[in-house]
Amino acid sequence: MLIHPQFDPIALHLGPLAIRWYGLMYLAAFIMFLWFGRLRTRQPHIAAQGWSGRDLDDMLFYGVLGVILGGRLGYVLFYKPDWYLAHPLDIFKVWEGGMAFHGGFLGVVLAMMLYARMRRRPWMQVTDFIAPMVPCGLAAGRLGNFINGELWGRVSSPDLPWAMLFPQAQGEDRAWLAAHAQQAVTSGVQAVFDQYHMLPRHPSQIYQFLGEGVLFFILLWLYARKPRPMGAVSGMFLVGYGVFRFAAEFAREPDNFLGLLALSLSMGQWLSLPMILAGVAMLAWAYRRAGRNGNDAQAGAHA
């Protein structure tokens, strides 16, 4: 049985400025984007498209805006619309937390559409370029969630070797016990609670760090190393992320203000399903288009 170490959310102080771990994770994500982006520009089929270091810097600027604005608005609209409708000024209190990946994803999509229009590049050429780097940001974000002791997993068997006790979850632990009294006794988690005053849970942040982050990055990077039809890498990202996220949600505790929705699926799972369907459609379109044209223009230079 493991106990969450309860890290100080403040990583360091620079005079009056407090630097939080979560902020450092965002910084790490942006640095990894630039690092792997430069590696990607050296791949022959990508170099033929004329990408430069300046392109990376500009995309990062637009991407940061998309992540922050989209992530915040997505959380407001998808998860707590009633609260923010009654307390509209709280929308601007980003330091209190509240970001949604699916909203950040839509924000980045819109930001890249604007970037592609300004640079006169095909939009899918832009999204194909950045897609393999996105899992780096996902990994950094999930690591930040773990350090903060938030977004913990569902109650697990006490026999699970890596089951973890989250002191921050004690309120939800008591609510779970009240709703599942008989199950708590038969599964053995009541005995754990009697001893530690906490319930064993899945460290779902680590699952997502390893799945959506590390493993997904490796698979998508390897797929994108070779020339693919335009739109295929983006489609593969949508399918891959949707599948990884959908699976991880079975171990992640649903938001307590939402719970499980229709078919006992979480909000994260319902939002992932359209991503999977859109990704499959994009892959089918990309390869069908490449078959008709004989040789897709993915590796060609932009106008």
Swiss-Prot record:
GO terms under biological process: lipoprotein biosynthetic process
EC class: transferase
Chief place of localization: membrane
Membrane topology: Multi-pass membrane protein
Single GO term (MF): phosphatidylglycerol-prolipoprotein diacylglyceryl transferase activity
EC number, as in UniProt: 2.5.1.145
Membrane-crossing residue ranges in chain numbering: 17-37, 59-79, 94-114, 129-149, 204-224, 230-250, 257-277
Localization in the cell: Cell inner membrane
Entry GO CC: plasma membrane
Chain residues that bind a 1,2-diacyl-sn-glycero-3-phospho-(1'-sn-glycerol): 142
Biological function: Catalyzes the transfer of the diacylglyceryl group from phosphatidylglycerol to the sulfhydryl group of the N-terminal cysteine of a prolipoprotein, the first step in the formation of mature lipoproteins.
Protein name listed in UniProt: Phosphatidylglycerol--prolipoprotein diacylglyceryl transferase
Species in which this protein is naturally found: Ralstonia nicotianae (strain ATCC BAA-1114 / GMI1000) (Ralstonia solanacearum)
